[in-house]
Swiss-Prot record:
Residue ranges of the TM segments: none
Keyword flag Translocase: no
Entry keywords, A to Z: Acyltransferase, Flavonoid biosynthesis, Transferase
Described function: The primary product of this enzyme is 4,2',4',6'-tetrahydroxychalcone (also termed naringenin-chalcone or chalcone) which can under specific conditions spontaneously isomerize into naringenin. Substrate preference is feruloyl-CoA = caffeoyl-CoA >> cinnamoyl-CoA.
Keyword DNA-binding recorded: no
Entry's family note: Belongs to the thiolase-like superfamily. Chalcone/stilbene synthases family.
Listed name of the protein: Chalcone synthase 2
Gene it is expressed from: CHS2
Molecular-function GO terms, alphabetical: naringenin-chalcone synthase activity
Induction comment: Strong in response to inoculation with fungi.
Active site: C166
PROSITE patterns: CHALCONE_SYNTH
GO biological process, one term: flavonoid biosynthetic process
Organism: Hordeum vulgare (Barley)
Annotated coiled-coil segments of the chain: none
Length: 399
C-alpha cells in the first residue's frame, strides 16, 4: 500500500504537459557603442594609441564582426575613475567586482520586470528563480539580490549559476524545463544577466584572442517565465520546450576557457572554435531530431547562439542552411553583439516578434519545429528541441 501511495504522490507532483515559455523580457545598459568608431574609442580610453599596428588589426576584426552596435555599462567616465581596468593585466579584481555586484542584479531586474509584465500574473505565482551570470560571484548571490529587488516571496526556490559562459542561456531553459515538468503548477523565472566589466582590459600584442572578445562581446540581460500546463485564460504560450541535452565536443578541451584572476576574467579562444562546432553540429541535430523523423534542417526554425559571424557562417555551410534561417541570430549579433548567456533568449524574443510582424502562422517563422543551440566553454553544446505555437491574433485591447 505504501508503494502505491508513493506512486500516487509522485504522479500528483508532476505536470501533465511540456514546459512552455510564457513570456520573455530583455534589457541593455543605456550606454551604446557603435562598432564603426569603437576601435578609436577603445585604444584612446586604454591609452594604447601608440600601438598603431595592433589598432589596425582590431579595426579589421571589428569590420568583419557583422556587429553594428553594442551596449556596455562601462562608460568612459567609469573607466577614467578606474584606470587599472584599462591596463592589460593590472590587479583590478576588487574594482571590477564592486561594479558587477550592483549592476548584474540591476540589469537582470530590468529584463525580469518586462517578462513579468508580459506574463501578467501576480508575483506570488513565481515558485522558482534560476539566475545565470559570468560576473560578480558573491554570497548571497545575484539570485538573492534579484529576489529582493523584485519583491518575490522569500520562499521562492532559488538556483544560482556562475561561470557558465555562452551556453548558459540554453542551460537555464533545460533546468527550467526539468523544474516545471516535475513540479505541478510551478512558474520558473529564469534570468541571464551579463556585463563585460570583468573582462574589459587594454590591448596586448601577445594576446590577440583577448582582442577578439573585445570586438564581439556586449552587455545585456534576458528573462523568461517557464511553466507547464498554461492557464488558457490568463497565460499566452510562446514556445514549448520539447527536449534538451548537453554534450562536450570531442577533442575540444581548451578551445574556449576563462579564468578569474586578480586582473579580472581572462578569456582564451582557439582559432578553430567555429570549425569544432560546425564539425559536430550535424550529430547534435541527428540525435535531437531522430525521434521526430526530421532530417531536413531547413524545415525547422533556428535559435543559434550568436557567438560570432564565423560560427554562424560555418554552421550554415556545414548543414546547407538557407541564409534566412539564421536571420534572428544575425540580427541579435548585429544590434547587441555576443551577450554570452543572455543571447539565445534575445534571439527567441526577436523571432517571435518578427514572426508576428511578418504575418506568419507560428512564433517559429511559420514553422512548427525548431532547434536552440548554446555554444560555450568546454567546448560545451546545449541542444533544445522547440515547438512553436500559433501567433496570437491581436485583440481590440492589445491593438
Amino acid at each position: 500500500m505504501a508503494a502505491v501511495r508513493l506512486k500516487e504522490v509522485r504522479m500528483a507532483q508532476r505536470a501533465e504537459g511540456l514546459a512552455t515559455v510564457l513570456a520573455i523580457g530583455t534589457a541593455v545598459p543605456a550606454n551604446c557603442v557603435y562598432q564603426a568608431t569603437y576601435p578609436d574609442y577603445y585604444f584612446r580610453v586604454t591609452k594604447s594609441e601608440h600601438l598603431a599596428d595592433l589598432k589596425e588589426k582590431f579595426q579589421r576584426m571589428c569590420d568583419k564582426s557583422m556587429i553594428r552596435k553594442r551596449h556596455m555599462h562601462l562608460t568612459e567616465e567609469i573607466l577614467i575613475k578606474n584606470p587599472k581596468i584599462c591596463a592589460h593585466m593590472e590587479t583590478s579584481l576588487d574594482a571590477r567586482h564592486a561594479i558587477a555586484l550592483v549592476e548584474v542584479p540591476k540589469l537582470g531586474q530590468g529584463a525580469a520586470e518586462k517578462a513579468i509584465k508580459e506574463w501578467g500574473q501576480p508575483l506570488s505565482k513565481i515558485t522558482h528563480l534560476v539566475f545565470c551570470t559570468t560576473s560578480g560571484v558573491d554570497m548571497p548571490g545575484a539570485d538573492y539580490q534579484l529576489t529582493k529587488l523584485l519583491g518575490l516571496s522569500p520562499t521562492v526556490k532559488r538556483l544560482m549559476m556562475y561561470q557558465q559562459g555562452c551556453f548558459g542561456g540554453a542551460t537555464v531553459l533545460r533546468l527550467a524545463k526539468d523544474i516545471a515538468e516535475n513540479n505541478r503548477g510551478a512558474r520558473v523565472l529564469v534570468v541571464c544577466s551579463e556585463i563585460t566589466a570583468m573582462a574589459f582590459r587594454g590591448p596586448c600584442k601577445s594576446h590577440l584572442d583577448s582582442l577578439v572578445g573585445h570586438a564581439l562581446f556586449g552587455d545585456g540581460a534576458a528573462a523568461a517565465i517557464i511553466g507547464a500546463d498554461p492557464d488558457q485564460l490568463d497565460e499566452q504560450p510562446v514556445f514549448q520546450l520539447v527536449s534538451a541535452s548537453q554534450t562536450i565536443l570531442p577533442e575540444s578541451e581548451g578551445a574556449i576557457d576563462g579564468h578569474l584572476t586578480e586582473a579580472g576574467l581572462t578569456i582564451h579562444l582557439l582559432k578553430d572554435v567555429p570549425g569544432l562546432i560546425s564539425e559536430n553540429i550535424e550529430q547534435a541535430l541527428e540525435d535531437a531530431f531522430e525521434p521526430l523523423g526530421i532530417h531536413n534542417w531547413n524545415s525547422i526554425f533556428w535559435i543559434a547562439h550568436p557567438g560570432g559571424p564565423a560560427i554562424l557562417d560555418r554552421v550554415e555551410d556545414r548543414v546547407g542552411l538557407d541564409k534566412k534561417r539564421m536571420r534572428a541570430s544575425r540580427e541579435v549579433l548585429s544590434e547587441y553583439g555576443n551577450m554570452s548567456s543572455a543571447s539565445v533568449l534575445f534571439v527567441l524574443d526577436v523571432m517571435r516578434k518578427s514572426s508576428a510582424k511578418d504575418g506568419l502562422a507560428t512564433t517559429g517563422e511559420g514553422k512548427d519545429w525548431g532547434v536552440l543551440f548554446g555554444f560555450g566553454p568546454g567546448l560545451t553544446v546545449e541542444t533544445l528541441v522547440l515547438h512553436s505555437v500559433p501567433v496570437p491574433v491581436p485583440t481590440a485591447a492589445s491593438a
